[in-house]
Amino acid sequence: MSENNGKQFINGQRVAANAPTIESINATDYQPTGYLFSQATLDEVDQAAQAAYQAFLKYQHTTQQQRADFLDEIAIQIENLGSKLQEVAAQETGLPLVRLQGETGRVTGQLRLFAELLRRGDFYGARIDTALPERKPLPRVDLRQYKIGVGPVAVFGASNFPLAFSTAGGDTVAALAAGCSVVFKAHSGHMATAELVAQAIEKAILNSGIPSGTFNMIFGSRVGANLVEHPLIQAAGFTGSLEGGMALFNLAQNRPQPIPFFAEMSSVNPVIVMPEALNARGEKVAQDTVASFNMGCGQFCTKPGLIIGIKSPAFDQFVTALIDTTRTAVPQIMLNQGTLKSYQQGIDALLNEQGFKCIASGQAPELISQAQPHLFQADQSVLLSGNPKLQHEVFGPMSIVIAVDDEATLLNGLEKLAGQLTATIIADESDLPQAKELLNLLTRKAGRVLFNGFPTGVEVSDAMVHGGPFPATSDSRGTSVGTGAIERFLRPVCYQNTSQVLLPDVLKDGNPLHITRLVNGVLTQN
């Protein structure tokens, strides 16, 4: 394994005009880890985009099998990093080794899942309408459509998942699977981790015969805007704050050539607890709820940050159980000093906001890098008025509980909520007749609606949706988890009256790739 040198990854080379001055910081004590990195220059941003463009011109013509083998090889090379990867990531993020071991498996599993998607071939969306020269009153020409990669993609690493939403995370894998090249902007919170994974990707490129420049990575806090504005970048993926996401989104839309910008940003992920479920198992639901909003120190974008139920003795007992469980919750290390500061500011803002009160706090922190869990209660008027403080995601181990008068008030209040990544209904069988209207409402509000589970687990699969209406994401038509994520980096192209000699294999007569296609309105592999 290569030693840390802190240089950019551009066109298969390590380059740096600036001396390595950006320090990687230990998340536990805020001391330097010893890893140093170079701030990318504007010229290096341009070099990375140029390299990605030149690579795309070749990489877009690789076969689905070649790309699948490439993704499999990345998975192998990441596994070959061994425990060193988790150890460095733990140092930079404060996350437990067991969590990072699971996250490594998530990354390699995701790579292999996309490889399966490529071999299956349905991502092409192949549609063929053969010519009907005798059709009256007008003949029909031969039309054949499939999807191709949009071009070089900029990807921004997320702070809270140093592996799964980072260098070889969902956005990168989806773009590579689509036939797009990538310029990855490493997150400042785990640059050494990113460097290790980028080295693995570079080895996979060499071993697979993939064009150099298919993957590039740059470091630095002042290059994101330049990357999004670069004319050769054709799409971008982002996971982070609402403020950061919208700033980059606006840059992407204000370019001379606007580009798709897929940002996952802000969600409070409401959990609705139904009356009969509380009567049957209220204490267990409370314990599971607190465990969910404290998981990973509350640093999940799917953390349940809002808990709502209808006033009743059972709901009062449920709140008491929430309080008791929260008080036993232990402090955990947050990802970095900036994240902890933002969390504390969010807590202070709620403490000073009318209609909110803190009703329970977890055990006091023992380290300067730890966050204390909190449970707030808010008046139903806060929900009914659409108070922005209620809808502002406080990233960390906290949640807000609200009791409403009745079902009509519940539905009225939920209408005031903005878009969400998830919405959860905790219900028993006898609650289901009342849940239908609630389900319809939440379906309009969220990308994923759960029953009797908690949203902090996000399965990587074909059916998963990790997205939702604004401000959960900048574009509710996509997902950043699961094989559907590839759709964000594809565009359709149609060939009309084109010779079989010139057509791509995916559209040729005889179906040489043996994939499922829509031919004259019929799904077939013929």
From Swiss-Prot:
InterPro entries named in the record: Ald_DH/histidinol_DH, Ald_DH_C, Ald_DH_N, Aldehyde_DH_dom, Aldehyde_DH_Superfamily, ALDH_KGSADH
GO biological process, alphabetically ordered: D-glucarate catabolic process
Catalysed reaction equations from the record: 2,5-dioxopentanoate + NADP(+) + H2O = 2-oxoglutarate + NADPH + 2 H(+)
EC number: 1.2.1.26
Entry superkingdom: Bacteria
Coiled coil: none
Active site per UniProt: E264 (proton acceptor), C301 (nucleophile)
Keywords from the UniProt entry: NADP, Oxidoreductase
SUPFAM superfamilies, A to Z: ALDH-like
Pathway annotation: Carbohydrate acid metabolism; D-glucarate degradation
Binding site for NADP(+): S159, N160, K185, A186, H187, S188, G240, S241, E393
The UniProt record lists the keyword Chloroplast: no
MF annotations from Gene Ontology: 2,5-dioxovalerate dehydrogenase (NADP+) activity
Entry's transmembrane regions: none
Pfam families hit by this protein: Aldedh
Family affiliation: Belongs to the aldehyde dehydrogenase family.
Record's function text: Catalyzes the NAD(P)(+)-dependent oxidation of alpha-ketoglutaric semialdehyde (alphaKGSA) to alpha-ketoglutarate in the D-glutarate degradation pathway.
Protein name: Alpha-ketoglutaric semialdehyde dehydrogenase
Organism: Acinetobacter baylyi (strain ATCC 33305 / BD413 / ADP1)
